[in-house]
Amino acid sequence: MTKQPEDWLDDVPGDDIEDEDDEIIWVSKSEIKRDAEELKRLGAEIVDLGKNALDKIPLDADLRPAIELAQRIKMEGRRRQLQLIGKMLRQRDVEPIRQALDKLKNRHNQQVVLFHKLENLRDRLIDQGDDAIAEVLNLWPDADRQQLRTLIRNAKKEKEGNKPPKSARQIFQYLRELAENEG
């Protein structure tokens, strides 16, 4: 019996897989299913958007009609259509779609935070008066001090008289206009 040299396996043709770039990455079946389910949820989020928001998301020619059809369908047909949309999304680069969707969600969250800040500022204006007016004038130098004082005085009277808070709403609207004109 002849003994083979120990390096005889190194001479096998086609065995040049020493590059890390050529390495095969194995993905489990469960991970593939999780990714497919996540894309189906992404498709459902897109389907739940309104027409104006849908226009802001980059969708190609055959994906958009599928989404519009899913918006019109109810019950079991909708589920099947969402499956189809998920399948279509698997064949595409979904990163631009995700970014546009995140941008839409973030814009809504920023607006909610801004409204809470304006409501707190309105309440401080009613409670503190001139100190809070100085804060508003620092934030928005073009704000009308006299109009703010009038609205604050009326809001205090309405609060004391247990009347509907018409002036408080007007203060909020005025602050919102100032914030929108700024940005």
UniProtKB/Swiss-Prot annotation:
Species the sequence originates in: Shigella flexneri serotype 5b (strain 8401)
Phylogenetic placement of the source organism: Bacteria, Pseudomonadati, Pseudomonadota, Gammaproteobacteria, Enterobacterales
Pfam families xref list: DarP (PF04751)
Keyword field contains rRNA-binding: yes
Name of the protein: Dual-action ribosomal maturation protein DarP
Compartment(s) where it occurs, according to its Swiss-Prot or TrEMBL record: Cytoplasm
Alphabetic keyword roster: Cytoplasm, Ribosome biogenesis, RNA-binding, rRNA-binding
InterPro entries: DarP, DarP_sf
Role: Member of a network of 50S ribosomal subunit biogenesis factors which assembles along the 30S-50S interface, preventing incorrect 23S rRNA structures from forming. Promotes peptidyl transferase center (PTC) maturation.
Record flagged with keyword RNA-binding: yes
GO MF annotations, alphabetized: ribosome binding; rRNA binding
Similarity comment text for this entry: Belongs to the DarP family.
A single GO cellular-component term on record: cytosol
Biological process annotations from GO: assembly of large subunit precursor of preribosome
